[in-house]
Amino acid sequence: MTNSSPPFSTIHQFFPGNTFLNFESVRILSTAPYGGCDAAEFLTAIAAINPKDPQTWADAWSHMAHLAETMAEEALSRGDVVAARDGFLRASSYTRASGYLYINGPTLDEHHPLAFEISKKVQSLFRRALPFLDCDVHVVEIPYVVDSPERKEVMLPGYLYLPNAQHRLPDGKIPVLLNTGGADSVQEELYYIHPQGGHTRGYAVLTFEGPGQGIVLREHGLHMRPDWEVTGWKGYSSTLKREVGVELDLDRIAVAGASMGGYYALRAAKDSRIKACVAIDPFYDMWDFGTKHISGLFMSAWTGGWIGDDWVDRIIRLGMRTNFQLRWEVGVTAAFWGIASPAKILKEMSKYSLKGGYLEKVQCPVLVTGAGKSLYFDTEEHTMKVFDDLGHLEERWRRVWMPNRPEEGGLQAKIGAFGLANMKAYGFLDEVFGIRRVTVES
């Protein structure tokens, strides 16, 4: 045997020529090692999907969700809690997938008619699996005061995953990872990444949804904000301190997120109470990303005032008629920002940036990653600019991991390589927090 690279350079294409659907398919398959997908169910659903008809995607995954839920109910009736757990996890995962391609608008009335129902179903199915997981899981609520004249308080839903006695660290104290979501994920999907990898390593992991995300968007209509970290340390801290009888180490708190969640993690890392940050494939500047493939001449005419927003809207909407992915992307951003105009959506992107020295405020160790096969972010324009702006940190506490091949973590958000991503992330956190693990010979 040789150590040379195998004679392939890409990943299997479930839908040849459709990068978007291929990526979303691998995203679902990525949860298989941790209970979110079954190989035969996955392949059966894929075979039923016509890439030119988005409704077949919804129908295929809805069917698999119903099948998995039925299996879970049958297992539960017989006292087989392992099969019940697995069935409920898969049903929740497939339900999320079933609604993923629905087109939404800027107001709750303009969301897809099934959007809220699907969000609630994802949550309820997932919660039915919680009592049977191999860790303690507490459903928590984090208070958030809406930035409006009414100052209304909304309770943000979260899950706190705690390691069982078998996985506790020798010193008895439990380090904490705050795991943020991104633009289109839900926290039930986050379980398959850092939470399942954290509790088995002795970490507590807190996931939560904030403005513009998941059920918070669908139920309360709260829109995303660039300073997302204002969801509040006070709320996280009080939630963690309420865990009576559990010795959470509030001097060892880290934050992690992927894609847009990586941007949020970097913003949150400026808080001195955050002792480490893992930013998985974040963007550096959303405006640069959103306008990269638009003609420079056209951009100059628009930003220079020679053409107005109405012209930009017309051109983008013309493209939306024939390009489903563009139509879906505009719908997603319209929903989480509450903006109908494509031109105004692009302008909103300019608020989501780490330019201007923001990262100089970050004083904790940071691991930032990039993805050579990213569907969205160029590594030089995003990953390396983040890394360069962290130049004030000690070299040993400013790390970059930028794999290129899919099996090495080269897809956006480390899709298809969650296990490897956790090995890198928790290895870095162990080092920062001084956690030494006993080496075991095979």
Curated annotation (Swiss-Prot):
Pathway: Mycotoxin biosynthesis
Active site residues per record: S259
Source superkingdom: Eukaryota
Alphabetical list of Pfam families matching this protein: Abhydrolase_6
Alphabetic keyword roster: Hydrolase, Virulence
Broad class of enzyme this protein falls into: hydrolase
Gene3D superfamilies per UniProt: acylaminoacyl peptidase, alpha/beta hydrolase
Subunit structure: Homodimer.
Role according to the record: Hydrolyase; part of the gene cluster that mediates the biosynthesis of the mycotoxins phomacins, leucine-derived cytochalasans with potent actin polymerization-inhibitory activities and monocot-specific antigerminative activities. The first step in the pathway is catalyzed by the hybrid PKS-NRPS phmA, assisted by the enoyl reductase phmE, that are responsible for fusion of the leucine precursor and the polyketide backbone to produce a 2-pyrrolidone intermediate.
Family to which the UniProt record says this protein belongs: Belongs to the AB hydrolase superfamily. FUS2 hydrolase family.
Protein name in the entry: Hydrolase phmG
Gene: phmG
